[in-house]
Structures are given as C-alpha cells and as structure tokens.
Amino acid sequence: MMNLAQKIVASSFARLAFCACLVFGAFATEAMASDTLSIWVMDNGLGSKNAMKRLVKKFYRETGIPVKLTSLSWGEAFRKITFTFADSNDVAPDVIQLGSTWVPHFAAAGAIRPIDSLISKIDTSRFLGEGLRSTHISGKPETYAVPWFIDVRGFFVNERIWQQLGFDDSDFESYAHVLGVLKTIASSDLKTEAGVKVTPFALPGKDDWTGQQCMAPFVWSHGGDFVVPSGKGYRSALLDSNTLVGLALYAKIMGDAQMAPHSLFENSSENAEGFVRSERVIHYGTSELIKQLEFPEQAGGLANSAIAKDGIKVMDLPAGSHGKFSFMGGSHLALGNKKDTSKYALAEQLLAYMLRADNIDAFSRQVGFLPADRSILHIWNRDSRYSKIVAELEHSRSFPNIPEWGEVEKVLIDLSNNMGALFVNTKHQKKRSAALAQMVYEANSKINEILNHSDSLNGSEKMHWAQHIFLQDYNEIYPKSAAEIIGRSELPLVDEIKDKIGSCRYLLISVGAGFLALCIVLTCFRRKKKK
C-alpha cells in the first residue's frame, strides 16, 4: 500500500499530467485549426454538395490538410461575400466560387488576389477562351480566377410532342421558323394526361433574375448588344437599331397570349417546372436539366417526371439576321485576398487540386454542367444528350468583363420584369410599344450613368424610333405540318407573310391611289358635261 506521502506525490503527478494534456491538447487543436483551409461554394444543384464533400475528403487524404466546406445559396452569395471581405476579413474564405460575371467586380473591390504565378502550374491553356475572358478585368493583364464549369443555355423540346406534331429539326433553323412553330403549337388541341392544355413556350416575366440571359440570344442573333466599347470605357447599346430588333422579338413572344401565355406570371424556375410537367413543348434552359433526369424523385430529381417519360431533345440554335448565339456563363474559382497571408501557399495548393482535370470531370458529372476544361469536353461530346450542347459553345458568348457589369445586370433584370408587368396591364399594341420604348430609353440612361458615359442622344427621336421598331412585324415561317394542325384556310401563304410587313403602308398607298383615280374620273366627267 502507498503511504500518505506517496499518495500525495502520485496525486500531484496525476494532476500535473492532466494539466499538461490539456495544455498540449489545446496547442494541438490550435495548430490543427491554423492549418484548416476554408472554401466557399454555391449550391450548384442536385449532387453538388455530396460531390464537394468527396473532393474535400480526397484532398485531405492526399495532403493531410483539412478543409472547412461552406455552401451558400446563390441568392445570398453576392451580399455575403461582399460583407465578409469588407467587415471580417479574417473569416473570409481561402478559396471561393464566383459566378463568371462576378470576377471583375470582386477583383476591382480587392476581395480576390491575382493568380498569375499559378498559370503554368494549373495550365490555363486547357480552358475555353470565352471562359478565360472573364478571369480578368477588361483592359488589365492580371488574372484573378480560373473557369471551373460552364453554364451554357440551349433550346430543349419535348421529344414525344415534337414528333407527334410532325415537326422536323429544320423547322427550328431561324427565329422566323421558331415563330411559325410556336403559333402552330398554339393552334393545336394537345393536353397532358392531367387534362392541362399544352402551351408552346414561356419566358420569365415576373420576379425573375435571369432576364438578361434570356434576352441575350435574341439580341446577339440580330447584331445587337447590351453595352459596347466607347472611347476608354463602355456605353449602353440598348437604343442601337439591331438591339431594338432583338428586344422587339423577345417582347413579341413574351407578350403573346398564344405563343407564351404563362410568361407574364412566371419566373425562370416556374418556366422549367412547366416544361418538366410536359405542359410546355419548348424550353430555354441549362444543361443541368439533362442530369436531373438521372436522379430519383426522393433525391429531388426528375427520373419519375412527365418529361423523363416523353424525352428531351436538344435543338440547334435558331439563327437571326446576324447568326446564331447563346449565353455562356458558369463559375470560376478564385483565391481570397486576406490580411493573414500565412495560409496562402496552402490555399494555392487547394485551388490547383480543384482545377485538376480529374476533379473537374468528377464534379461536372455530378451536377450536369459542362466542364470548363477542353481536354474533357471531347468525352462529353460522345454522349448524344450533350453533343449539341457542346457544339453550341462555338456560338456562345459571355457578358463583358467589366466591374460595373453587376449593376448593369440589375437594370436588365428590371427591364425584363417590367416588360412582363407592362404586358399584363396594357393590351393595346400601340400603347404597349410606346410604353416599352420609354422603358428601354430609361434603362439605357441608367446604364450610361453606371458606366459614367455622357449621353447626348435626342430622347424624343430615339423613343420614336424605338416605338417604330417595336411596331414592326417579324417574318414567320410555318412548318410543313402546320397545314394539318392549323387548317389550310387559316395558314398564311409565304407571299402573304412577306407582304404583311408593308401591309399598312400598302393600304395607305392603295387608298390614296383610289382617291386620285376617282378625282380624275370626276374631272373628266365634268369637262364632258360642259361641252
């Protein structure tokens, strides 16, 4: 047995050992925390969270460096990133996902740091040129981010209904053809299994956030743009003639009660839901829709949906007067510009790891967005579901890489939503056109103010010109099967369609000529009477 002295000594050593464990344990925990990296990513759809967890665990196995993963919603991301870097830089992320159009803004704000020293290690030659354009601020050489995945939009159709109506791929080759197809579908009496009338198409006209992306193909395909270089900066191009033609077509479809009857009451998510329920024949959306068909309903997927049964067909982009274009966005990865630079080297290691070809491929396959790495794209091209989406990259454009684009984008989003509100309350075509011209003129002025561009345009003349373009008819080419669906007596002839553009002018000339002829006859009759 231990005597009292021995017990006291033993007890003292035990306490000392326990304290030592606490102290060294605290140091160990602190050391571990100091090595932990932080990465912020958005919720990129079904499968994205699990895919990121796997990538982070794999990185830890390879390097021994722990990573704290934070997932943000797209709705909160911009604001949270802005405030975190401005107010509490210490807890800002080491690596961060940014929407492609956000990179110039956060680079100019000093929230992310240049990564030029990593270019050769990452090998940015692997990435698409259009994606690389938004990795820096326009006119400046520094690179601030690297493309991660691509968000390219395309036109999808319900394959079963498309075939049932007897349509062909050539019936979608131009926007004139698209109008003919939309009007043909509108004249059909198709209904879903639930008895809901099938409608042709929908654009987001209420409480939406993607208006600029949806307007883009209409504007670009007709030679227009939202902003263009001017001197040392940029100016709004909303009142340029080609832009107005594209906006007029967009507005024509959005405000048409037959071609897109639900546009004025839905956002882009609701547009997609209608397509998924097979209540719409055509949808303009992203490639992630294809991937969602693989996930069961329990996981939030679309494997049991109506569109999964009917099938999705990806169409070639329709052409306008200046070619065919679609919007290409996506997400980039960047490095946080932090006051504490002690983990910069580790953060660079994580960035390079995330951008490895195998990791880009693994993540992209889970979320359904195209990989930004060209060396992987050729593999995706073998999949018939994605081959046309990959082919669209040749005709895809991104928005300008200027710091002000975020503010410009808000004006364009408001413009699209305001169009929807206008069309709900105003049915008269001339009143619609006048109000729309005023709306575009005001948006043009706001954008020029954001870009610090002095506008010397004559407002009344420009609004009058815009209204004139908004009143013009757009050519329509009907599919061959339209005669059976609409009825031959109701189907416009090709010559009638061509003449429709100048019908009002022709009517005035005809009336004038008739009046002149009547005057001549009356004059001759009076002269004969005098004789």
Residue ranges and their predicted role:
Residues G99-G154, A194-G195, G211-C214, I307-P318:
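Hinge/lid segment of periplasmic solute-binding proteins
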Residues E394-R527:
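Conserved C-terminal helix/tail region of periplasmic/extracytoplasmic solute-binding proteins
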Residues K58-E130, R160, Q164-G166, E273-G274, ...:
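Extracytoplasmic "Venus flytrap"/periplasmic binding protein-like
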Residues V181-K183, P229-F265, L317:
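Glycine-centered hinge/linker elements that transmit conformational signals in sensory
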Residues D116-L128, T199-G205, G224-V245, Q298-I307, ...:
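Short, solvent-exposed loop/beta-turn-alpha elements that line the ligand-binding surface or hinge
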Residues H136, K309-L317, S364-A421, Y478-P479:
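Long, aromatic- and glycine/proline-rich binding clefts that accommodate carbohydrate-like moieties
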Residues K140-W148, R153, H177-R235:
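Extracytoplasmic/periplasmic solute-binding protein
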Residues H136, E142, Q164-L165, G255-P261, ...:
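Extracytoplasmic/periplasmic substrate-recognition and gating elements
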